[in-house]
């Protein structure tokens, strides 16, 4: 057995034999810390857009929440289901099955991203109008979402495989990937918004780049030889049984995100009659609550 295989086996033995209380602490603390750090995405974007672009931009930002909710729902459909299946299969010592889930999850996320990026990119104006955009907020919403769309692929890959990383025995490393993305966004957002004077586009571009950093860090983990689960040949062909097992588990949390989309659509359209000040107020509240894979 090589050193890399020994390290991977040691991780699995720790999951099998360590006290439950210790495992709970080791896995829950990095998760909580990582999620708190990720909230910086929302806080930083909201503050900088408000100061650098204006109050109307916050209203436009609120219109984009349903789009992000739908994209997140598709990511959760795969990410949450794959994470649970990986945990179960590793517990059963079925490493081949866990690897197939990993490969199928990658293909499904890429397919999902291609579909929603294409649909939103082609029909963005009618979609935003249906989601409550007015003549004043549409330009801001369009600018933000068109630049953010490519980054939603990176977001789904980063968060989906971040959860799988945690489930396969690497909670601290999973936390580090989220911290990396948040810090990158904290540095890049002011540069793109103020220094380069790109406004709301700059916020979206900074988020895209930050999530790309996180995605690269996450995906690099799964090509290492010393991990419990890695990308290998022969795991990317979609199998109906594997896809069904992923989707059946991920459907419930995905529906929660989809429901958030429809709630936001109703709120946006209801507020349109009251004017932009109310939209801005609710937009700030919604932005504070929204985060990918919440």
Model-derived features with residue positions:
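Small-residue-rich hydrophobic transmembrane alpha-helices
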Residues: 58-118, 155-174, 268, 281-283
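Small-residue (Gly/Pro/Ala) motifs that create kinks and tight helix-helix packing interfaces
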Residues: 162, 188-189, 193
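Conserved small/polar residues in nucleotide/adenosyl-binding loops
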Residues: 279-286, 294
């Amino acid at each position: 057995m090589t050193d890399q295989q020994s390290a991977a086996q040691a991780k699995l033995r720790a999951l099998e034999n360590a006290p439950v209380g210790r495992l709970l602490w080791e896995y829950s603390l990095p998760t909580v810390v990582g999620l708190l750090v990720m909230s910086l995405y929302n806080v930083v974007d909201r503050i900088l857009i408000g100061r650098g672009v204006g109050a109307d931009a916050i209203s436009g930002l609120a219109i984009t929440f349903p789009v992000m909710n739908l994209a997140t729902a598709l990511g959760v459909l795969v990410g949450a289901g794959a994470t649970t299946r990986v945990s179960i299969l590793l517990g059963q010592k079925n490493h081949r099955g866990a690897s197939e889930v990993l490969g199928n999850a990658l293909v499904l996320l890429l397919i999902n991203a291609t579909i929603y990026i294409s649909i939103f990119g082609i029909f963005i104006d009618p979609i935003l109008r249906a989601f409550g955009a007015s003549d004043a907020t549409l330009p801001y919403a369009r600018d933000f979402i068109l630049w953010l769309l490519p980054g939603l692929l990176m977001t789904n890959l980063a968060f989906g495989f971040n959860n799988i990383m945690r489930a396969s025995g690497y909670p601290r490393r999973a936390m580090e990937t989220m911290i990396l993305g948040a810090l990158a966004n904290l540095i890049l957002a002011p540069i793109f918004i103020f220094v380069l004077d790109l406004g709301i586009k700059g916020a979206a571009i900074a988020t895209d780049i930050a999530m790309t950093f996180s995605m690269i860090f996450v995906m690099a983990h799964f090509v290492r030889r010393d991990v419990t689960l890695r990308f290998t040949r022969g795991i990317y062909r979609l199998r109906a049984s594997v896809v069904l097992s992923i989707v059946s588990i991920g459907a419930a949390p995905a529906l929660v995100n989809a429901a958030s989309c429809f709630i936001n659509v109703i709120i946006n359209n209801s507020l349109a009659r009251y004017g932009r000040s109310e939209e801005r107020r609710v937009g700030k509240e919604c932005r504070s609550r929204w985060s990918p894979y919440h």
